[in-house]
């Protein structure tokens, strides 16, 4: 319901602003003829050139570009190296084992503390 009313409102607003919702008759001459906008002449210079913002082109340093492209290729090859992938896997595995062991130690300490509290209460 809400979507339908929103769509009707948008369509009505569009037709209202454009003024072309419905033509009066087939022979109506009330329409506007196609032509250039009066402000379109503002964008053309006296020399018939368009007035666009000019940007100075920097001189390209091809040697630096070449070094960058080889650097990217070198990085891509490093990422595809299976030896480094295996090393990374084992390093991450060691970190995971360390975190798991720390969690187990904390759980054991909590269990020990609960037993001590239970013994002291009885």
Curated annotation (Swiss-Prot):
Record InterPro entries: RXLR
Signal peptide as annotated in the record: 1-21
Family to which this protein belongs: Belongs to the RxLR effector family.
This protein's UniProt keywords: Host nucleus, Secreted, Signal, Virulence
Subcellular compartments: Secreted; Host nucleus
Domain remark text: The RxLR-dEER motif acts to carry the protein into the host cell cytoplasm through binding to cell surface phosphatidylinositol-3-phosphate.
Region (Nuclear localization signal (NLS)): 87-98
Segments of this protein annotated with the region TAP1-binding: 69-86
Residue window of motif RxLR-dEER: 50-68
Function: Effector that suppresses plant defense responses during the early stages of pathogen infection. Suppresses cell death induced by effectors and PAMPs in plant hosts. Interacts with host acetyltransferase TAP1 and causes TAP1 relocation into the nucleus where it acetylates histones H2A and H3 during early infection, thereby promoting susceptibility of host plant to P.sojae.
Phenotype upon gene inactivation: Leads to smaller lesions on soybean seedlings.
GO CC term (a single one): host cell nucleus
Listed Pfam families: RXLR
The protein's assembly and partners: Interacts with host acetyl transferase TAP1.
Record-given protein name: RxLR effector protein Avh52
Organism domain of life: Eukaryota
Main localization of the protein described in the UniProt heading: secreted
One record GO biological process: symbiont-mediated perturbation of host transcription
Effect recorded for residue 98 to A: Impairs host nuclear localization
């Amino acid at each position: 319901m809400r979507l339908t009313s929103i769509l009707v409102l948008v369509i009505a607003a569009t037709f209202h602003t454009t003024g072309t919702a419905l033509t009066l008759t087939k022979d109506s001459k009330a329409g506007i003829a196609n032509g250039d906008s009066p402000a379109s002449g503002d964008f053309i210079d006296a020399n018939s050139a368009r007035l666009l913002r000019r940007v100075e082109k920097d001189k390209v340093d091809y040697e630096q570009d070449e070094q960058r492209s080889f650097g990217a290729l070198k990085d891509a090859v490093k990422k595809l190296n299976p030896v480094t992938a295996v090393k990374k896997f084992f390093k991450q595995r060691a970190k995971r084992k360390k975190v798991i062991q720390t969690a187990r130690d904390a759980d054991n300490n909590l269990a020990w503390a609960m037993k001590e509290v239970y013994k002291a209460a009885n």
